[in-house]
């Protein structure tokens, strides 16, 4: 029996998008052999309004619209809604997706969509900031998700991204002043002073990306007026419970560029020979001095400094840097740097909150008193309490990692590989990544190699799965698979998130098995990686990865396991027929 569909297209101007979408969907319905009744909201052509008879005949109602649509007439029908732009790239695939994902519209849902409260919400102006530790994938994917969902609901939105290249699409004072709502989707510390007096909602990039509609709804319901100087103790305690991870990730995000630059410059020095840097006055020696003697020397102080900065703002930076330098000089390594950062940050915050000075001396507090007392406290604790034990732990860990047998190496590779694929850029993934980056300062390069190789597997595997099992994926998913494969080559695990969000019970296990195998093989082959990011493009730097061929084999094997594994696990009932 021929499928009958009712289609409504609408865009704010009622000119181009609405007419183009109507034409594309009409042609696509003919291609599929479906009968379509189309209502095109336009300001330049006389539009047809769906009759009651046409709506009753329709098996499915599709609303490709940016704006408010009268929903009451569709109560009891299977309805699919999307932004108008979603239907233009692949209209046939869009119609198939609509047929699969449409849900019955209840009277309550229709009333909610048409109510004055909802109409007022649809006119809201939103400003947002997204930021993640590495500033590569989650930052921009979360921004795109927010923009798409807000546009779908009829809101005006502007998102400032704080990525690895700095702040882009920056919010102006006028835009902030005009905003009805501020959304902060960040996994690191973001300055909020400019949002004083605004309704503000905080969330993570992961939740924003995976549950965009829910988080947008939560933002309207749970946003509270922000005041940088008058936050309640309850709010501060609630923030602090989830703040430790955010403080750590702030330190890691600022440390990463230093480590990447240093690691690649060290790798360049090896072009002239593995031990060429020992000859003074040579270019190799200069490169080693820049990368190893300077960049890597700054790694732990920067980590500790920005952990403290995240906790106590600028007054925490100096004691954090000093504590980090002491951690480095005492051999406490990155673990000592983490401890130093939290010591410095919380001691500086305690002094700022508890020490009260006369108004005439208040200006001395952030410049003199806090840095002096917090640095003294942090330094003494690092030297007399923390330094020794942490140094012993780091020495033991480094010695174990450098001298462990193949069995232990494989086990470590399995654990690190599985962790990298467990939550695709989440806390477990970042814990494994931070562990590998921290060991670079101790000239331990094998775990970092296993971590990056395993981290590439999920996105590469999903790309492979969409290629070898095309009939099980709709057109949009196949396009996402191509993008995922490219992201995987760049060591951006988040390319697999769209697949994991739809089918987590199959995607995550397939990724973890592939990642664990890749991590194990990388450790077994003795692969070493000098830089903690860049994916296969690091191969352009001689000696940045060794041995290259075996490293590529490890990645290829894990990718094949994940790709073929997911292709087999994906239920045939989920298959998307290519033909109508």
Curated annotation (Swiss-Prot):
A GO term for molecular function: protein-N(PI)-phosphohistidine-fructose phosphotransferase system transporter activity
PTS EIIB type-2 domain: residues covered: 3-100, 124-221
GO biological processes: phosphoenolpyruvate-dependent sugar phosphotransferase system
PTM annotation (Phosphocysteine): residues: 11, 132
Family annotation (SUPFAM superfamilies): PTS system IIB component-like
Enzyme Commission number(s): 2.7.1.202
Keyword NAD: no
Record's protein name: PTS system fructose-specific EIIB'BC component
